[in-house]
């Protein structure tokens, strides 16, 4: 059995997105300050150091394939 909020919340979000947001968004966009969108911090853009790091749980060294065969 599925809990009531698991059914009600997605339905309410769909109703908001489909019917209420087209009327609310134009009003909010006029009031909301655009400074937050225009200010970008470009200090760390493009700086990525992933050498020797685990990605998705796989280490960079050693085999990455998983065997499905049982070993006795």
From Swiss-Prot:
May activate the NF-kappa-B signaling pathway. Belongs to the UPF0729 family. Undergoes ER-associated degradation (ERAD). Interacts with DERL1 and AMFR. This is UPF0729 protein C18orf32 homolog. Residues 1-33 are annotated as: Necessary for its localzation to the endoplasmic reticulum and lipid droplets. It comes from Rattus norvegicus (Rat). Coiled coil: none annotated.
């Amino acid at each position: 059995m599925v809990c009531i909020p698991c059914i009600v919340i997605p339905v309410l979000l769909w109703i908001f997105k489909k019917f209420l947001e087209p009327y609310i968004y134009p009003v909010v966009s006029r009031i909301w300050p655009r400074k937050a969108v225009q200010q970008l911090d470009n200090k760390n853009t493009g700086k990525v150091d992933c050498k020797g790091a685990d990605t998705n749980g796989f280490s960079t060294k050693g085999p990455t394939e998983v065997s499905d065969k049982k070993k006795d």
